[in-house]
């Protein structure tokens, strides 16, 4: 199968309301690690904060993928609490699927634009660990990045976002019974 070159842009604007691993009443020393197609980039550590305006662009170029690989590829964003003595601890993470980003309708084709997402720690998936505001773009050969939306539209999106996110997830248990009948 032939491979196509893709480019990924992730504009990390900010993280907000982080829940430090040492407890909700303390501050964190956050940094963000972005991984894509076996490559990683990270921000600097920001000391004693739970709200950080990173305003950092991550660019991953020449990601060679077959169509099947493209459909399974993800962009992983992890927020860590830096520790001097102990191992750095994961606060929360979020993953963007290439296919989902690529399939966004016009006018934001191939882009998820300035969207707040909930950061989750896999060890405690029912608890929100903070929020992240980012724009993600996946482009193939000859693609042109979408034109940014008006600043007025963006600011209203940002102000509304945390209200919309809230804790609304519920866990469910599903019980299946499968019967097999033969020679009835």
Which residues does each predicted region cover?
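C2 and C2-like phospholipid-binding beta-sandwich domains
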Residues: 13-16, 28-31, 44-54, 59-64, ...
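Short consensus segments that form the blades of beta-propeller domains
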Residues: 20-24
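Short strand-coil-strand connectors
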Residues: 35-39
